[in-house]
Amino acid sequence: MNITIVGAGIAGLSAAFELQQSGFEVMLLEDSDRLGGKILTSEIEGFNIDAGPDSFLTRDPEMRELCFSLGVGDELVPPTGKPAKVWVDGEMHNLPKRHFLGVPLDLEELDELSLLTEEGAKRAKLDLTLPDNKPKEGETVGSLIRRRLGDEVMDRLVGPLLGGINAGDADDLCLESGVPQLFNASQGDFSLVRSIQDFLKNQNRDPASPVFLTHPDGL
């Protein structure tokens, strides 16, 4: 049986590989001049730079299983190096020391964080008193974060971090299907930050286990 797959991003390439492994003849069609879709690694000044997503989440086994099927599973490593920073207004700024996918877990720390303005830090702290924390049906990541913590936390913390993970705009990313771990952590009745704190306390996950994995040569 011959099968045609349209689009050679990660989904198309993975489907083609699985079908070939099952004995099917596969034709892969791609409109652009390269394969990989959102995933693109370029060499700049001797360094491999990921222009799209630079790692994958380990909470689901599919990506790790695919890497082992491709023969590179033993080469996977957690991203390491200098702490992540965000470029805002012509300067590099540190992320909070404690955060969950960009959501700050210590709101008092925001007063000393150069990434946010004084007004942005004050707005974020309103999360502790605002009612109606639970996500609404079909709500996006951007909608929840802006509603609970304000625009600056979204634009300068959560947006850049999740944009790097998902290679897309977090304002358009469905919370429940796109970032299920944040959706599950935000089910408390009051305060998104406290809800996440309680969620993390109840997790049995090994804290030493990496949240992300990547390949040394880039995705």
Give the role of each language-model region.
Residues 20, 68, 147:
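Short polybasic/polar patches that bind polyanions
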Residues 20-44:
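Glycine-rich FAD pyrophosphate-binding loop
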